Swiss-Prot record:
GO terms for molecular function: structural constituent of ribosome. InterPro entries: Ribosomal_bL19, Ribosomal_bL19_CS, Ribosomal_bL19_sf, Translation_prot_SH3-like_sf. GO terms for biological process: translation. This is Large ribosomal subunit protein bL19. One of its GO terms (cellular component) is cytosolic large ribosomal subunit. It comes from Beijerinckia indica subsp. indica (strain ATCC 9039 / DSM 1715 / NCIMB 8712). It comes from the Bacteria. PROSITE patterns: RIBOSOMAL_L19. It holds the Pfam family Ribosomal_L19. This protein is located at the 30S-50S ribosomal subunit interface and may play a role in the structure and function of the aminoacyl-tRNA binding site.
Amino acid sequence: MNIIETLEAEQAAKLLAKRPIPAFQPGDTVIVNVKVKEGERTRVQAYEGVCIARNGGGLNESFTVRKISYGEGVERVFPIYSPNIDSIKVVRRGKVRRAKLYYLRDRRGKAARIAEKMETPAAKAAREAAKKEAKAAAKAKKAASAAE
């Protein structure tokens, strides 16, 4: 691992400690809460759509979300570690066999639907256990930093 990769990994870990990023992939429906500044006021705006691509790696990683707004397709690219992103929430998991879902741009209505990935009870239990473990690790890390 070279120096740049090491620095990027440290920075990413620091940013993840502040705001955890859920595991999601193309095909998943996500809600991205974006901080929008209007004059002096800052508010949070929800942007819900299907993740159609994930690009890059490390600190430069980004993802593209597509939604239909008033009958018009709208796509927005979000850097994963952007300070303008308040939170990311996965609404449903999609079952797709491609990394880039750009073909959805040409489809309308039912043709643009993505089948939902069904989760087995064992996988769900494993995910919940991992979530609890991550929460406990974050709590321990916070307690350790407070003790210093």
